[in-house]
């Protein structure tokens, strides 16, 4: 069944000690059924998430419980991984019931064809960021990390979390990346007439650029920056803020 209104959220970075507490996001998840009938999480829901084969890190139990409850109530949930949480797998897909993509995806949202990507790796300005993007996606890197004890792996990830941001914490870098994303999105829409939407995240900069023919580029901005999200219907895209 095609959804009539998709709730879009990105860049909550749950687990980052400096970010907004998870309870605010849990209140948002409770409100999602009143906002729309499908949830799309476009990357960096967590400041770090890595799925082990037989161990589930306890840090985000409450969030997964909320997501599982939404699925139990029939809410479709899609999660496109970001540079902090692209390493999901069977736990998300089978146990929680989420449609998980480790990279970009093409989806039908509210009857509109959409290219969805978190945005890292698309417009990186520095060679080091491009290299990091390739290394963290490589199967050998993922396999090696999986051999570490989870306590050690999560400790190491916490220490390296800043590097996963690709230098994206600098305001000027984010502004430049946001401009590059808009150019990328408009170019993609121009090249591919079958696409109605391009949906990105990563820069923490909200953006909505509407084009003729009911087509648009949208970045909802960062949830951690003022509880930002967006709504997508068959005819509109709207940037919003949640009141927790």
What are these regions (language model features)?
Residues 1-7, 107-115, 211-216:
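Beta-strand-turn-beta hairpins that frame and shape the catalytic cleft
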Residues 2-5, 14-109:
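Core catalytic region of metal-dependent phosphoesterases/phosphodiesterases
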Residues 4-11, 44-46, 155-168:
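Short, basic/glycine-rich phosphate-binding loops at helix/coil junctions
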Residues 119-181:
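Active-site-proximal loop/helix segment associated with metal-binding centers of metalloenzymes
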Residues 10-13, 44-45, 83-84, 119-120, ...:
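Active-site metal-binding loops of divalent metal-dependent hydrolases
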Residues 16, 49, 87-88, 123, ...:
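Hydrophobic positions within alpha-helical membrane elements
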Residues 95-102, 115, 120, 124-132, ...:
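Conserved beta-sheet core of the metallophosphoesterase superfamily
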Residues 6-8, 39-41, 115, 199:
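Residue-level marker for buried hydrophobic side chains located in beta-strands
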């Amino acid at each position: 069944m095609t959804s009539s209104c998709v709730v879009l959220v990105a860049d909550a970075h749950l687990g980052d000690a400096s970010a907004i507490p998870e309870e605010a996001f849990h209140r948002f998840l409770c409100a999602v059924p009143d906002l729309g009938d499908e949830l799309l999480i476009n990357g960096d829901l967590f400041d770090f998430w890595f799925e082990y084969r037989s161990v589930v890190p306890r840090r985000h139990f409450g969030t997964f419980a909320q997501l599982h409850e939404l699925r139990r109530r029939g809410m479709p949930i899609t999660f496109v991984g970001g540079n902090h949480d692209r390493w999901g797998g069977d736990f998300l897909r089978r146990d929680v019931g989420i449609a998980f993509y480790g990279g970009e995806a093409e989806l039908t949202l509210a009857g509109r064809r959409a290219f969805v990507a978190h945005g890292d790796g698309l417009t990186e300005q520095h060679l080091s960021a491009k290299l990091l993007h390739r290394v963290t996606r490589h199967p050998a890197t993922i396999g090696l990390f999986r051999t570490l004890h989870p306590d050690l792996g999560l400790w190491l990830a916490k220490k390296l979390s800043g590097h996963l941001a690709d230098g994206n914490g600098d305001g000027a870098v984010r502004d430049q990346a946001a401009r590059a994303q808009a150019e990328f999105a408009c170019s993609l829409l121009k090249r591919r007439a079958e696409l109605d939407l391009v949906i990105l995240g990563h820069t923490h900069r909200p953006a909505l650029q509407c084009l003729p023919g009911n087509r648009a580029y949208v970045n909802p901005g960062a949830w951690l920056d003022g509880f930002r999200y967006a709504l997508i219907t068959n005819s509109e895209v709207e940037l919003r803020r949640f009141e927790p």
